Structure formats: C-alpha cells, structure tokens
C-alpha cells in the first residue's frame, strides 16, 4: 500500500518537473529553436491545427527558423498565426518557405523573460508540494484506519519529503540553466 503511494507520488513529481522543463523550453532565448513555435496553432480548413502537423520547422542559422509548409496554400495562414502569437516574431515568405528571423533580445526583455521563467518554476514547486501533500494525506488515512503503524507513517513521510526535495532540486537546476541561457549575449 505505502509503496504504491510512494511510486505514484514519484511518478507525479517527475511529471511536474518534465512539464516545467517543457514549458520553459518554449521561452525564447537569443538562439533559434524549432520548439519555439510548438505552441502555435493555425486555422486549417476550419479547425485549429498545431504548426508541427502542417509544416516542418528547421534552424537555418542561429537567428533564423525556416518553415517548410506541406500545403503551399497554407503559407499565408501560417504567417498570420506566427504574427498573432505573443512571441514578437515577423515571418517573411522566401519562395516556397517561410523565414522567421529572431530579433536579438533587449536587456529589458531578458529580465522580463527571467521573471516569467521564475514564475513557472514557482508553479512547478507548488505542484510538487501538492503531490507531497496528497501522498501524505493518503498515508494518514491508512494510519487512521489502522492499516499501518505510526513508524510506517513517519518513515513514509520522510521518504516522500526526500522525493520532494529531489524534484524541487531538479526544478531549480533547470531554472538556473534557463536563466543563464537567457542572460547570455
């Protein structure tokens, strides 16, 4: 019983960390990355479709993304979706492809992005702590039903706390890496 609760908590904490890493990978740094456009959806024959399903996104150079749209008639819609996103990008058609130059980040924008990333990190920490609370509540319920001893309860809480500390350490490490990446010129 307790081992199942611990395993469940560990899996959920790992999902929180991975979700955080995915979220911050979408934050624009000075370098071009195809994942930058992951959140963009394009209206394709009346339905909203992720850009990844309509085109291939490659890195042309450190400051330019190249989008090869599978259906040529969707080029203008893809450009419109990129401009409508809050990424501050200005795509341009280059023959059959769309080029998306990434303007250099200003110091002020870097600081804003750092604040955003810190906020995401705090949300991830809160999510990890919520998983810890849920696991501890389940163990307390077992203790209340006299299914486990107080020693098992204490031991389980200590192990869940160790898992929580490890997950938060991973979040902090990813945050430090992203902040360093954002502040590079």
UniProtKB/Swiss-Prot annotation:
Disulfide bond residue pairs: none
InterPro entries: Ribosome_recyc_fac (IPR002661), Ribosome_recyc_fac_dom (IPR023584), RRF_sf (IPR036191)
This protein's record includes keyword Transferase: no
Pfam families: RRF
GO annotations of cellular component type: cytosol
Alphabetic keyword roster: Cytoplasm, Protein biosynthesis
Any single GO BP term: cytoplasmic translational termination
Keyword Membrane in annotation: no
Known role: Responsible for the release of ribosomes from messenger RNA at the termination of protein biosynthesis. May increase the efficiency of translation by recycling ribosomes from one round of translation to another.
NCBIfam families in alphabetical order: frr (TIGR00496)
This protein's name: Ribosome-recycling factor
Species assigned in the record: Salmonella paratyphi A (strain AKU_12601)
């Amino acid at each position: 019983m307790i081992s199942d609760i611990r395993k469940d908590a560990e899996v959920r904490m790992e999902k929180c960390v991975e979700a955080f890493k995915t979220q911050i990978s979408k934050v624009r740094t000075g370098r071009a990355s195809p994942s930058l456009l992951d959140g963009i959806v394009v209206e394709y024959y009346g339905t909203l479709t992720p850009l990844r399903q309509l085109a291939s996104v490659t890195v042309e150079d450190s400051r330019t993304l190249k989008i090869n749209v599978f259906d040529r008639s969707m080029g203008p819609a893809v450009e419109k979706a990129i401009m409508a996103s809050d990424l501050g990008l200005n795509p341009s058609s280059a023959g059959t492809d769309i080029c998306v130059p990434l303007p250099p980040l200003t110091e002020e924008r870097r600081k804003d992005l750092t604040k955003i990333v810190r906020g995401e990190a705090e949300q991830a920490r809160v999510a990890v702590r919520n998983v810890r609370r849920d696991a501890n509540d389940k163990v307390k319920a077992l203790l209340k039903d006299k299914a486990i001893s107080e020693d098992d309860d204490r031991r389980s809480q200590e192990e869940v706390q160790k898992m929580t500390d490890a997950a938060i350490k991973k979040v902090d490490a990813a945050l430090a890496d992203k902040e360093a990446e954002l502040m590079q010129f």
